[in-house]
A protein has these predicted regions:
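Metabolite-binding pocket within alpha/beta catalytic cores that recognizes anionic/polar moieties
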Residues: 1-151
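Generic non-transmembrane alpha-helical segments
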Residues: 10, 14-17, 158, 162-172, ...
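His/Asp/Glu-rich mid-to-C-terminal helical/loop segments that flank catalytic regions of hydrolases
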Residues: 233-277
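Active-site/ligand-binding-proximal alpha/beta "capping" segment
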Residues: 165-202, 267-268
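Non-catalytic positions within long, well-ordered alpha-helices that form the structural scaffold/packing
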Residues: 99-102, 197, 216
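Zn-dependent metallopeptidase/amidohydrolase metal-coordination segment
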Residues: 206-244
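Short acidic/polar active-site loop segments enriched in Thr and Asp
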Residues: 104-105, 202, 221
Length: 277
């Protein structure tokens, strides 16, 4: 917590007027949303105590403070994945810092593989629930009763409704499904994909779940969106690679960023922390 306090002090010193209400966490293909920011300031993670050094292509490693529409936001452009260090709490300090700065909502994004043949590359999926296949938690070592976090409504129903309404208004098709977290960095085998489908998963990726757990532990309400970059292993003739993920993510980046910015700017945030479309 001392590191969180140091990061918070740094931000309050260099951005004393910042009062973000919504935290955004951007995965591969979603970086274009920063072009929708106004009155923005940028802080490299390297300049913020306890913030991780993102080592994966497509993750800038920068915090932006600004506005999207009338909503003050804090944008985490890039995350640290569990496979980079072996630890799954790499985003703990950034998320706790932004919560302390005033963020009551986390809108996070990722690039994912599809287990649904009808949901091909370039599709967007609203995360309704997740499966923690890694069976690890970023809360290990936490104390107090707050560590026993209920996850029955991990992805906020009213925020999902707002997202669907915005997508309908923009004419953007938005799938909804279950995201399954694998540690990586290797891609899944065809046999694993068949097993995951039997478990009820619709998309698979290497992030998002730890950050959702951290946000719910802090009391933040969560919305998550997946940009589908490929059909999962064994579902097509493609050889999966990170380069393919980045290339496919770039193709749909404009659509994804436009939808995300519209969702955030449409939120009506009341003083009591409620949100409505």
């Amino acid at each position: 917590m001392a590191t969180t306090a140091a990061a918070l002090s740094c931000l309050r010193t260099h951005a004393p007027k910042a009062r973000p209400q919504v935290a955004l966490l951007l995965g591969s293909g979603w970086g274009g949303v920063t072009s929708h920011l106004v009155d923005s300031e940028r802080f490299p993670y390297a300049n913020l105590p306890g913030f991780p050094q993102a080592s994966v292509a497509g993750h800038a490693g920068e915090l932006w403070l600004g506005r999207i529409g009338a909503v003050e936001v804090a944008v985490l452009s890039g995350r640290q994945h569990g496979y980079e260090t072996g630890a799954v709490d790499g985003m703990a300090v950034p998320l706790r810092t932004l919560h302390a700065l005033g963020c009551k909502f986390l809108v996070q994004t990722n690039a994912a593989g599809s287990l649904n043949a009808d949901m091909g590359p370039g599709s967007l999926m609203l995360v309704a629930d997740h499966i923690n296949m890694v069976q690890r938690s970023p809360l290990v070592g936490a104390t107090g009763s707050e560590r026993f976090v209920g996850m029955a409504d991990a992805y906020d129903r009213s925020l999902r409704l707002a997202a669907r309404q915005v997508a309908n208004r923009l004419g953007v098709k938005l799938f909804e499904g279950v995201y399954l977290w694998c540690l990586g960095p290797q891609f899944e085998t065809p046999a694993e994909i068949r097993a995951f489908r039997a478990l009820g998963a619709d998309a698979v990726g290497m992030s998002t779940v730890p950050e959702t757990i951290l946000a719910r532990h802090a009391g933040m309400r969560v919305l998550a969106l997946s940009l589908i970059t490929n059909l999962a292993a064994g579902m097509s003739g493609e050889q999966l690679s990170h380069a393919l993920t980045l290339a496919q993510a770039q193709l749909a980046s404009d659509k994804a960023s436009r939808l995300l910015a519209a969702i955030v700017s449409s939120l009506s945030l009341a003083g009591d922390g409620s949100a409505a479309p």
